[in-house]
């Protein structure tokens, strides 16, 4: 887990980028070149920036994007198979993954059956040049399907002005290795108007957990062309293919943990149900966009991005026995296309911003019982569905420059989501046989409708208002009040005969926050206080009404509130100290705690950057939290069933660069990286094996998520 924001950055006015609300943030290091990242003086919300220096030097070369996001206050995630070796989810402000927007160069990407994200198949460290983390719904111009939990914008790599080729080789714990080739053309063309960079890499690892093997191949390319002094074209494309043996059930047994066995997951014995050959993924993904930024004249700017990304998760996994139906043949796939069009206009009053986000996702999913020895599927699926999600979000906002010190930005966004479903008849796992008869003996369906179609539309008006006031040239304060929303999961119609009425409403959140930012060449400080009311989940009624309809019942509100602060201090002689902390409460109206939400987090990091050395020793502590359980009777969760103690993770990165080690080499950098330096094995998640299991009454079969052991990576990069 990374635990320090990476290096101080401040916005600089760049005319072609000012319209790009979610895209590239121009950055400049402070004169000391040692201070960690900081909030921006012009910010209107709680925002942290992580820079390329952090990603290149203080993140494992096999890491995914969650290690970059973890660098910011309050953010955390765990990968029980090791850093970069699993599908890791980030939590921030007590909200788990699926409650926030993650974007790449301003383009939101997410799963289509819920707003979740897959870190192991999109945007590894090789593709990332930093991130901007906004822990708020943002302004009206902030787009996405779950803005209330924040917007985390990953940035692509900056292109080099000079020609360069980088060769990287890395070896590490658990037979982990990575090789990478990266080439920068530098500026080329008659007037140096073109620039291109590409990266190709392969990562292999046995993983910390037994037989949880990972094999990842990735490619990315970025091209920029200055068409004129007022117009710039940017194109990006990436492809990844992940193959592994990760099972559907990823935890270890409590009985193993009690014996000091922290990584027993899969077996090499084909007579056992957890044989690794019965559990495997093949997940190819791609992500591409073409964007143009141009000055239209009379103060108008325009940016347009056309994008496409796809995800094809073919997973096969076994259950707890070996039979002709104990395994599952699973597919989760989607292709998303969209367009983000933005305009802005400067005037004496300030800046007008308006635009439209259009997004269409075509999805196909199924799960079918299968024989793990032959992978022959039964006839009737657990479910099989196709659906199209169409999103439209037009917005308008105006940043009023009241005077040289005060800016006020009101805005409004209209969010429209339409989903069109076609469910095939199934064995009762979702919509049932649709009037037919299902035979459990033969796993077939006789008669009934082949499929059923449904459609649902969700809409919301999402206003926002924010203000920034400069108390002094180096001291600002801000306030914001904003709405955010999230559409329900696609399981809305996963009831008998797909008859659901009424359907759930979108989750609506209202967020208020105030904050302040102070900075100098030697010190930066940022702090904020926030309060959020969030609509709680909906639960399906246990029985249908007289018309056969199942209702979705509102379960009440959730209230999140807290304070956050971060600061960095240049100590001199290349040393700097970074600290951050969060303190909050995350509770339902009933007063019970939200699962997975720590009461507090703290980070302390000591950095040394001088001459050929770049080092970072960071400690991050995640406070105690709760996990829910399953009751002996009924279907609702048991809140606060399991209490998890505080977790502290220490990481160390040491980089040493040798300039011109030989006539052909520009420089060679050697990096030693250690994650979980003190080899902690704390429990970070619990899933009860039997109903009624709690911290007070644990079951030895409970499944535990445990910190992976210490991992060490030695990496060498040579530039030619």
Report residues per predicted region.
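C-terminal beta-signal and adjacent terminal beta-strands/loops
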Residues: 530, 535, 624-628, 656-720
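A beta-strand signature from Gram-negative outer-membrane beta-barrel systems
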Residues: 27, 122-168
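Membrane-embedded beta-barrel scaffold of Gram-negative outer-membrane proteins
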Residues: 292-295, 301-317, 470, 476-484, ...
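Extracytoplasmic beta-strand/coil segments of soluble accessory domains associated
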Residues: 47, 57, 63-108
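Periplasmic plug
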Residues: 49, 89-137
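Face-selective signature of the C-terminal outer-membrane beta-barrel domain
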Residues: 232, 283-316, 321-441, 468-470, ...
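Gram-negative outer-membrane beta-barrel transporters
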Residues: 404, 530-543, 551-632, 715-719
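Transmembrane beta-barrel wall of Gram-negative outer-membrane proteins
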Residues: 164-166, 170-248, 280-295, 348, ...
């Amino acid at each position: 887990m990374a635990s320090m924001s990476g290096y101080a950055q401040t916005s600089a006015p760049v005319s072609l980028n000012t319209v790009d609300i979610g895209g590239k943030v121009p950055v400049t290091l402070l004169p000391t070149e040692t201070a960690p990242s900081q909030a921006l003086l012009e910010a209107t919300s709680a925002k942290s920036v992580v820079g390329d220096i952090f990603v290149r030097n203080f993140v494992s070369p096999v890491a995914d994007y969650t290690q970059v996001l973890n660098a910011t206050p309050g953010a955390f995630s765990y990968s029980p198979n090791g850093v970069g070796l699993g599908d890791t989810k980030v939590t921030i402000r007590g909200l788990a993954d699926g409650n926030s927007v993650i974007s790449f160069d301003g383009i939101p990407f997410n799963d289509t059956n819920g707003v979740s994200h897959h870190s192991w198949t999109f945007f590894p460290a090789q593709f990332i040049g930093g991130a901007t983390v906004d822990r708020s719904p943002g302004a009206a111009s902030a787009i996405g399907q779950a803005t209330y939990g924040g917007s985390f914008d990953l940035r692509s790599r900056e292109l080099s002005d000079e020609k360069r080729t980088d060769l990287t080789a890395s070896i590490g714990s658990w037979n982990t290795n990575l090789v990478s080739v990266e080439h920068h053309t530098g500026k080329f063309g008659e007037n140096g108007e073109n620039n291109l960079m590409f990266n190709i890499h392969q990562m292999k690892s046995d993983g910390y957990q037994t037989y949880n093997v990972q094999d990842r191949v990735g490619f990315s390319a970025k091209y920029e062309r200055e068409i004129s002094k007022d117009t710039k074209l940017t194109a990006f494309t990436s492809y990844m293919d992940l193959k592994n043996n990760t099972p559907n059930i990823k935890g270890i047994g409590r009985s193993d943990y009690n014996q000091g066995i922290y990584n027993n997951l899969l077996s090499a014995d084909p007579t056992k149900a957890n044989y690794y050959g019965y559990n495997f993924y093949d997940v190819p993904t791609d992500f591409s966009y073409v964007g143009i930024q141009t000055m239209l004249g009379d103060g108008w700017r325009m940016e347009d991005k056309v994008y496409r990304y796809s995800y094809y998760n073919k997973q096969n996994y076994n259950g707890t026995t070996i039979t002709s139906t104990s395994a599952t043949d699973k597919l989760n796939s989607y292709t998303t296309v969209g367009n983000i069009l933005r305009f802005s206009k400067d005037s004496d009053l300030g800046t007008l911003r308006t635009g439209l986000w259009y997004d269409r996702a075509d999805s196909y999913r199924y799960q079918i019982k299968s024989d793990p020895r032959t992978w022959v599927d039964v006839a009737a699926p657990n479910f099989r569905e196709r659906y199209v999600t169409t999103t439209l979000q037009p917005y308008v906002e105006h940043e009023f420059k009241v005077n040289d010190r005060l800016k006020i930005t009101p805005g409004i966004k209209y969010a429209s989501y339409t989903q069109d479903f076609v469910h095939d008849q199934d064995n009762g796992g979702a919509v049932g046989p649709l009037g037919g008869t299902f035979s459990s003996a033969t796993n077939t369906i006789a008669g009934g409708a082949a499929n059923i179609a449904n459609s649902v539309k969700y809409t919301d008006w999402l206003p926002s208002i924010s203000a920034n006031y400069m108390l002094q040239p180096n001291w600002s304060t801000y306030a914001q009040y904003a709405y955010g929303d999230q559409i329900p999961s696609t399981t809305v119609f996963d009831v008998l005969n797909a008859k659901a009425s009424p359907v759930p409403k979108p989750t609506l959140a209202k967020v208020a926050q105030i904050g302040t930012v102070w900075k100098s060449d030697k010190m930066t400080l940022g702090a904020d206080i926030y309060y959020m009311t969030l609509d709680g989940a909906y639960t399906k009624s246990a029985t249908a009404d007289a018309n056969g309809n199942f209702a979705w019942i509102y379960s009440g509100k959730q209230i999140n509130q807290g304070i956050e602060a971060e600061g960095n201090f240049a100590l001199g002689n290349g040393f700097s100290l970074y600290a951050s902390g969060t303190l909050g409460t995350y509770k339902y109206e009933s007063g019970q705690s939200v699962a997975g939400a720590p009461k507090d987090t703290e980070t302390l990091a000591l950095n040394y950057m001088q001459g050929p050395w770049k080092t970072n020793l960071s400690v991050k502590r995640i406070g105690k939290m709760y996990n829910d359980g399953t009751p002996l009777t009924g279907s609702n969760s048991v809140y606060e069933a399991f209490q998890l103690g505080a977790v502290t993770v220490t990481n160390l990165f040491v980089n040493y660069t040798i300039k011109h080690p030989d006539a052909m080499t520009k420089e060679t950098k050697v990096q030693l990286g250690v994650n979980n330096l003190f080899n902690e094995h704390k429990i970070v998640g619990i899933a009860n094996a039997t109903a009624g299991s709690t911290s007070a009454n644990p079951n030895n079969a409970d499944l535990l998520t445990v910190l992976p052991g210490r991992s060490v990576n030695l990496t060498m990069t040579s530039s030619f």
